[in-house]
Amino acid sequence: MTERISITPTHRYRNNDKLIGIGNEFWDMSERNGLAGLVADLDSGVLRTTAGHEFVADGHEFINFSCCSYLDLDSHPRVIEGGLDAMRRYGVLDHCIARSRVQIPAMLELEDSLGELFGAHVVCSIAASTATFGLLPLIASGHLGNGIRPLMVFDKNAHISMSNLKPVCADETEVVTSPHHDLDFIEDACRKYARVAYVCDGSDSLGGYAPVKELAELQDKYGLLVYYDDSHSLSAYGERGVGYVRTHSPVLDERTIVVVTLNKAFGTSGAAIVLDGYEKETLRVIERFGGALNYSQLLNTAAVGAGLASAEIHRTPELTTLQDRLYRNIELFDSLVHTEQTGSTYPIRLVPLSDETVIEAGRRVFEAGFYVSPVFFPIVARGTAGLRVMMRAGQTEEQIRRLCAVLTEVGACPAIPAPGEAAR
């Protein structure tokens, strides 16, 4: 019998052996220490573990400081009622057919509302990752852009929902990875290639914003296309909650594409693709050839109704009130614990710890009544582990002060008092 061929992976764009081999050990440690696989009932902002977790006692109460609902809109009465109202109006949960063939008007209603909110054309998707899966290959082939196949430059820290598309895009064009927010690298690519597309987070899941204004200069100079996932700043930042990118970028045309999830501060479900300057024919190409964007798994009617209600809240002074509460809570945290994100409006703080101590620290914080998620490779680079703290508008001063006291006990750096403050 002829010897069968074994395959040697190229590992050019991903390496599951490395990701799983190293990362799974941390996940197993997290679960053994009660920091993963948790199931808990939620009542008035307090979570209580249920029976069934091998390593966590039933009935342990804790406050979740790793939730992305930065404005707590996911529990807003108007948002909940909006989902119910849409169900009553349309009389169906999910009209299961590709929207390019037949659709009920529910998602069109949400797209129109979000389009007015953003001042742009909006296409909705079931998830931001689904939107990215549909759009990046079209950018790589030149069908979304100016017709020229671009060099696809993925930021080293781009979220996995984007970086996972490297091998798919590489079947259409050349793909490279840049150091994090390295403007010189990007400009050098722009000088060499007729067209360049840069793929990055507008707001990083580990804290911080993209250099939007500096990238806009490269857009004006070279025609650079920038694809932003700005999910973590939607609603939490900017007038009417339009997010960091659309607040600060002076290039809001076909050279800037923004994808945002509606699951975080917006408080509902699904995602929005925010487009400027694209003709109807191009939008049809997205609808027809954007992969899962055109499958029968669309936003269900309840999610649409909740989205409509949240969008209406964004048009009222209540949004500013919630943003201000969030910012005050961020400032309070920064006055007690120092991180690299101190002083920014970004709602995520990363408390750096070693790979060896991060799980134990997270366990001690959990035992004290708070959940903060430990992050480790492959979520972050090896040797840069930490506890990820997410601030929300609904957190109380007492909760924040208690959490910060526990964090400093497990190794967080206390904040440096302002001049004159220590003497009080």
Description of each model-found segment:
Residues 30, 67-70, 347-356, 370-407:
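Conserved PLP-binding active-site segment of the aspartate aminotransferase-like
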Residues 248-284:
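Active-site PLP attachment segment
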Residues 269-317:
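Conserved core segment of the aminotransferase class I/II
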Residues 80-127:
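Conserved N-terminal alpha-helix of the aminotransferase class I/II PLP-enzyme fold
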Residues 2-93, 224:
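N-terminal "arm"/small-domain region of PLP-dependent enzymes with the aminotransferase-like
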Residues 175-227:
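Active-site phosphate-binding strand-loop segment of PLP-dependent enzymes
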Residues 320-334, 338-369, 379, 391-393, ...:
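Conserved PLP-binding catalytic core of the aspartate aminotransferase-like
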Residues 138-161, 174, 178-179:
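Conserved PLP-anchoring active-site segment centered on the Schiff-base-forming lysine
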